[in-house]
Regions:
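Short, internal strand/loop/helix patches
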Residues: 112-144
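Sec-dependent bacterial lipoprotein signal peptides
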Residues: 1-16
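Short acidic, S/G/P-rich loop/turn micro-motifs used as interaction or catalytic elements
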Residues: 69-74, 104-106, 163-164
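N-terminal "domain-start" segment that seeds a small globular fold
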Residues: 17-56, 77
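Short active-site neighborhood of thiol/selenol oxidoreductases, capturing the structured segment around
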Residues: 53-77, 83
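Structural microenvironment flanking redox-active thiols in thiol-disulfide oxidoreductases
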Residues: 76-117, 132-135
Length: 180
């Protein structure tokens, strides 16, 4: 909770920096762009293991949640429980959450220790070489664009965080319902 004021200030800063028209333009430019998820260049952690293949890689639709080096990775780990309702959607194997963390090299060990202590039962991908952003230059640096849905062709179909925006949550659920 001690990071809540910081996150609130960041959200206010972002909301004051971008006009709704600017956001619409950025989202419009992202939609339909093919996004590469270089699974083979990232490490996948699950509980106390390192694994090499997950349902995430095989799912038709992937909700990518990208946490870059500018964000507080351990803060995101502490908030992972909020994704519980969306993890339940993974039972239908056409959908999966894809958490990608790109921590600064100096923080990687502490992130690993923290992750294994949280006993989360969901894989996360750790991008230590920043290959995800390198292979996807169309993804803006602002955190508000770091959660998006990829369709079956790995094209961006929806941009936004369903935890923070009920309209995005409804659009995501409607999209998945249509595809079942």
């Amino acid at each position: 909770m001690r990071f809540f004021p910081f996150l609130t200030i960041c959200a206010l800063f972002v909301s004051c920096t971008f006009s709704p028209q600017d956001c619409k333009e950025v989202i419009r430019s992202m939609r339909g762009k093919t996004t590469v998820i270089p699974f083979d260049k990232m490490v996948c952690w699950l509980n106390d293991s390192i694994i090499h293949d997950t349902i995430t890689q095989r799912a038709k639709y992937k909700l990518v949640v990208y946490v870059d080096s500018a964000a507080c990775s351990t803060c995101y780990l502490n908030e992972m429980y909020q994704w519980h309702d969306f993890v339940a959607l993974e039972e239908d194997s056409c959908f999966s959450l894809c958490f990608i963390f790109a921590p600064p090299l100096a923080n990687r060990h502490s992130l690993q220790n923290h992750f294994f202590r949280t006993e989360l039962n969901h894989p996360i991908y750790v991008d230590t070489s920043y290959c995800f952003l390198n292979e996807n230059p169309h993804i803006p640096s602002s955190i508000i664009y770091h959660t998006f849905l990829l369709d079956g062709s790995n094209k961006i179909a929806l941009v936004g965080n369903p935890l923070h925006n009920k309209k995005i949550e409804k659009l995501l659920r409607d999209h998945l319902d249509r595809e079942r």
